[in-house]
Amino acid sequence: MKRNKIFTLILIVVSMAMGFSSCIGNDDDYNNNQKPTIDPVTYSYKDIYLQTSMTAYPFFSQVNSSVEKNKNFMISPLGMTEVLTMLVHGANENTAAQINKVMNTPWILPAHIMDAMKSLNDFLPKADSKTALAIANSQWIDEGYDVKNDYIKNNIDKLDAETLTQLLSTETTKDDINSWCARKTNGLIKDFLKSPLQQNTRMVLLNALYFKGQWKYKFDKK
């Protein structure tokens, strides 16, 4: 990845600012560069969920190693998968291969991963009437930055990503992103960004998850 990138992870919101060559310029599609060793159609949605869920352990370990000792933290492997799903179908060649490796889906086409995530996002919020779950995605594009329409449309159609175009490195955008995070997390995350994004930021992908449920085994309050 030759372009400058920003990767920030805080609690259950995942943000990535990036510039990838496949999102701009020619219409070369990542799918044309993929050469799965087995027919990707044989992968069921369940297979894809299992593959991506296996990233939770190394993800937790990586975050845990960077967190202050004895300090509580929370991560969302699902949130990471949502963002990487938006990301991978806009990447080519080595970049796409690296993202697929992180997702543990090296032989699965991005289009099939997106279909699986769409199905999961449709199902999970309605899976349990006693549990509240909201999943939100958004893509923020720097004003004047040329992003392929197909890429934008796929994120909208498959992952219901809100799409906003504005100058990203401004105080206004920082406030807008923080407001978005606050709305989508029911006010639990209000100050995701402490300062404006860097001037070389061209695109931001965001995922937010809000969950409220009852513990099957409650903690001792003491």
Regions found by a protein language model. Name each.
Residues 24-27:
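Bacterial signal peptide processing site
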Residues 1-10:
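Bacterial N-terminal signal peptides that target proteins for export
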